[in-house]
Amino acid sequence: SQVDQYEDAIPVLQKLIEQDPSSKLAYRKLAEASKATDDLEKAAKAYEELFKIDPRDIRVAISISDVYLENDDYRLALKWADKASSLDDKVGDGLGQKGKVYYYGWDNFRQNPFTNDDRLIAKLAYDYFIKAERKGYRGFSKSAWLKENEKDILYGKAQWFMAEDKVK
């Protein structure tokens, strides 16, 4: 099976990296193989080593964020999305990744009925998606759905006026 092929490739890639610790391709392939075999921690570590070799590669920062997101580590997913958005503010990919992290966090932790915190996180996701799309981002986005359901989901004037003074 394909998983077996990935499992067989991992020790070979590790040996390659021992021989040439600057091999971007070997780190990328190790990360992909680790992800395919569901070893998300090893995948994240391989991507992080790749990022050390090429610390300006926004795609690698986003890949690291995605692996942490897949592993439900929202703190590290957001940290790497932040790093991605700080690398290049001309493209919206990093901002889109931040929107994605906030959206998945909201989707995973929201309560019924929504709390103000839930609404704030949904609003952050929406705002980052919109900022990203204005910069040409075309990746994962729930901005249209969030906008369509904003009265029910997003933090807005109704919640602001209902908030206690100490919150404002």
Where are each of the predicted segments found?
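Terminal, low-structured helical/coil segments at or just beyond the last alpha-helical repeat
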Residues: Y126, K131-K168
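Canonical positions in the second alpha-helix
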Residues: L16, E49-L50, K83-A84, A132
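Residue-level recognition of tetratricopeptide repeat
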Residues: S23, R56-D57, K90-V91, G136-F140
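TPR alpha-solenoid repeat register
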Residues: A26, A43, V60, G94, ...
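Short coil/turn linking the two alpha-helices of tandem helical-hairpin repeats
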Residues: V3, L69-D72, G99, Y104-D117, ...
